[in-house]
């Protein structure tokens, strides 16, 4: 749900448009004005300082790296949103909630969108280079970039026939930045295979969390999407959408002990379990399948849980020499 208001004066498709209006439209296209972008900030929580692996990285450095990781995730996510809107512009123009998006309504051109996307992408790469130092960023960037490019195709009917839903791709992308944290803290001394092994629990948690949240968010468009045969996970669930959400949430919650096991921290257990379990229960009870708009409320609630978790992990960094950000 956008925070910025659409500029109210339109002069054709592009004529008479001010520079401010262009920037506002580009911001809307990339969702830099959207609370959903805060989702990517949880990727910064992938920066672990493990108790069983030697690291000389200071707490201040970890905070700096977390900030760079968050900036990278937000900028790359914004570039991905721009790409998604360009790919979906014809679909979006026929959906009530998205028909006024700048690309769908013709308020900005494809050239303007691609220029903006290139700027966002290149800036995100720069942030990652600053974060990883001497390490080559492209072994990390290429797979994630490929996922972002393919993501819009997951909504097409052919993907539905293959049982591939866009939430699969989104979940992988949201969890991917956990690898950056390990690579930044431990540097070139840790091979990518070892980084991946250590990130698996948090990655699985983020995969099912984002699957759960995006399914509820997309459910807002269920009526229009079904008419156009847009592929999404709620098509798999049908009338059992609440049951699907409950299953996804349960899997996400069940991974929390594996995420926290390396850390002997009562605070992390209390702050995670004490917030997530009642939070998820409240979300599922308040979700009403007969009111698609309730999916947006659920999604916002999950973002708040994510932000709370980032705060809790940041506080743990100050409470212990074994830290998670």
Curated annotation (Swiss-Prot):
Gene3D superfamilies, per database record: UbiA prenyltransferase (1.20.120.1780)
Membrane topology per record: Multi-pass membrane protein
Transmembrane segments: 60-80, 113-133, 138-158, 169-189, 192-212, 243-263, 267-287, 295-315
UniProt GO molecular function: transferase activity, transferring alkyl or aryl (other than methyl) groups
Source organism of the structure: Talaromyces verruculosus
Highest taxon above the source species: Eukaryota
Main location: membrane
Subcellular location: Membrane
Stated name of the protein: 6-hydroxymellein 5-farnesyltransferase cdmH
InterPro entries documented for this protein: Prenyltransferase, UbiA_prenyltransferase, UbiA_prenylTrfase_CS, UbiA_sf
Documented applications: Compounds in the chrodrimanin family such as chrodrimanin A or verruculide A exhibit strong inhibitory activities against protein tyrosine phosphatase 1B (PTP1B) and therefore, they could potentially be developed into drugs for the treatment of type 2 diabetes or obesity. Furthermore, chrodrimanin B, the end product of the pathway involving chrodrimanin A or verruculide A, does not exhibit the PTP1B inhibitory activity, while it functions as a potent blocker of insect GABA-gated chloride channels.
Record keywords: Glycoprotein, Magnesium, Membrane, Transferase, Transmembrane, Transmembrane helix
Keyword Magnesium: yes
Glycosylation positions in this chain: 214
Protein function: 6-hydroxymellein 5-farnesyltransferase; part of the gene cluster that mediates the biosynthesis of chrodrimanin B, a meroterpenoid that acts as a potent blocker of insect GABA-gated chloride channels. The first step of the pathway is the biosynthesis of 6-hydroxymellein by the polyketide synthase cdmE. The prenyltransferase cdmH acts as a 6-hydroxymellein 5-farnesyltransferase and produces the hydrophobic metabolite verruculide C. The FAD-dependent monooxygenase cdmI further converts verruculide C into verruculide B.
GO process annotations (BP): terpenoid biosynthetic process
Reaction(s) catalysed (UniProt annotation): 6-hydroxymellein + (2E,6E)-farnesyl diphosphate = verruculide C + diphosphate
Any single GO CC term annotated in Swiss-Prot or TrEMBL for this entry: plasma membrane
Pfam families recorded: UbiA (PF01040)
Listed cofactors: Mg(2+)
Family assignment from sequence similarity: Belongs to the UbiA prenyltransferase family.
Pathways involved: Secondary metabolite biosynthesis; terpenoid biosynthesis
Top-tier EC class: transferase
Entry EC number(s): 2.5.1.-
